[in-house]
Swiss-Prot record:
Transmembrane segments: none
Enzyme class: hydrolase
HAMAP family documented for this protein: HSV_DUT
Cofactor(s) the record lists: Mg(2+)
Gene source species: Murid herpesvirus 1 (strain Smith) (MuHV-1)
Protein name per the record: Deoxyuridine 5'-triphosphate nucleotidohydrolase
Pathway where this protein functions: Pyrimidine metabolism; dUMP biosynthesis; dUMP from dCTP (dUTP route): step 2/2
Record's keyword terms, sorted: Hydrolase, Magnesium, Metal-binding, Nucleotide metabolism
Protein family (similarity comment): Belongs to the dUTPase family.
Biological function: Involved in nucleotide metabolism: produces dUMP, the immediate precursor of thymidine nucleotides and decreases the intracellular concentration of dUTP to avoid uracil incorporation into viral DNA.
EC number of the protein: 3.6.1.23
SUPFAM superfamilies assigned: dUTPase-like
Length: 382
């Protein structure tokens, strides 16, 4: 069988004599496929009109080359650093190193500060009665009288309506802005369940009445730190459990009425102020005799000097060996200040701490008490 001679298909727009008539435009000049300039003068007008745009880069009627997109596949394995890549910071750093040359040492990256874990210890308290309004302000309580407080010649002890379980290693200190005519004696409550009270001493010549909201008593929770034995000089051993020291009289003391004296104790300590702060707090039994002791901050490498005031109209005799003040070593930052011009005693400015006082129910209160009892029993057994 003889096959018929079938001619090849011919494009009607181009002549057969042209050798490039069957080739696409991209194959005629392979070195000019990315050239966006005007075509050369040798090409005809029909070839210029049929040339595809450079972005598509047509090779044939059925195949097209497209622009390559940026791949984000490797970003899963090599994540970018937000701080170094922000606003081209990494590229600018490389360019700076190239300009400086190999002699300049590379710049060390700034270390990031480790974030401290937030550890806040909660201490539960309960309120009772209607004589005082108690509010929690973070690490401290504020008690304000809601009724008129009447003070007799010597003064009185007021229950603030606050019960709390003080954990081991802490103490509660009452601090007050002294109203005119009276002094709120600074007092300390140690480890265990405590009913917080305040001692008000009348320093006027007659009875005194305080209107509502006149007494503003702050209750601070302070950690009690125990110094090393070599850091104390002529101080007796601290009390077990409460971790505080005593300052006692070595000879009898006689105070005239309405007179003050500076007592010097031959004792000292070597604790640095940046690590610990030594507080001198008066003993509560002095308030019954209307003897006031100015609370102060005991500086290191110095003798203890205390100011004692007899607020009564009679002579007061104090025996030798009587405890005059309590010594507490706590966190730094506490400074003494005078609340007002009429104040005869100093107060303490206590900075904020990580403690949080929370008003809880009976269940929370008794649970904390059981924990303290179990810890006390285990320590006694040990």
């Amino acid at each position: 069988m003889i096959k018929p001679n079938i001619p090849a298909p011919v494009r009607p727009n181009l002549p057969l004599s042209s050798p490039d008539s069957v080739l696409p435009q991209a194959m005629k000049d392979p070195f000019n496929i990315f050239d966006d300039d005007e075509p050369s003068e040798d090409t005809s007008s029909s070839e210029q009109s049929s040339r595809p745009p450079p972005r598509e880069m047509m090779i044939s009627s059925s195949c097209a080359l497209r622009e390559q997109t940026n791949s984000s596949f490797l970003n899963r394995f090599f994540p970018e650093d937000d701080e170094s890549s922000e606003n081209g910071a990494a590229l600018a750093e490389i360019n700076q190193l190239l300009r400086d040359g190999p002699e300049a040492p590379p710049r060390e990256p700034t270390p990031k500060e480790a974030r401290r874990p937030e550890k806040m210890q909660k201490i539960f308290f309960q309120t009772y009665g209607n004589d005082f309004k108690v509010e929690a302000h973070g690490d401290r309580l504020l008690a304000q009288n809601q009724r008129v407080v009447r003070l007799f010649e010597r003064g009185r002890i007021l229950g603030l309506g606050v019960k709390m379980n003080i954990p081991m290693g802490y103490c509660a200190v009452t601090n007050c802005f002294h109203p005119p005519g009276c002094v709120c004696v600074m007092d300390m409550a140690g480890y265990g369940p405590s009913d917080i009270r305040a001692q008000i001493v009348n320093i006027s010549s007659g009875p005194l009445e305080l209107p509502p909201n006149m007494l503003q008593i702050h209750i601070h929770m302070l950690p009690m730190l125990l110094p090393e034995p070599w850091q104390t000089i002529n101080l007796m051993a601290p009390h077990q459990g409460d971790t505080y020291f005593d300052l006692r009289l070595r000879r009898p003391l006689s105070l005239p009425p309405r007179a003050s004296k500076n007592l010097k104790f031959e004792a000292g300590h070597l604790c640095e102020e940046d690590a610990r702060r030594c507080l001198v707090i008066p003993c509560r039994h002095l308030a019954t005799k209307r003897v006031l002791l100015d609370p102060t901050v005991w500086r290191p490498n110095s003798l203890a000097v205390l100011r004692v005031l007899n607020a009564s109209d009679e002579h007061v005799d104090l025996e030798a060996g009587m405890a005059m003040a309590k010594i507490i070593f706590t966190t730094p930052g506490i400074t003494p200040f005078k609340p007002s011009l009429t104040s005869v005693m100093m107060s303490f400015d206590v900075p904020r701490s990580d403690l949080k006082l929370v008003k809880g129910g009976r269940r929370d209160y008794y649970r904390a008490e059981e924990r303290m009892r179990s810890g006390r029993d285990s320590s006694n057994e040990g």
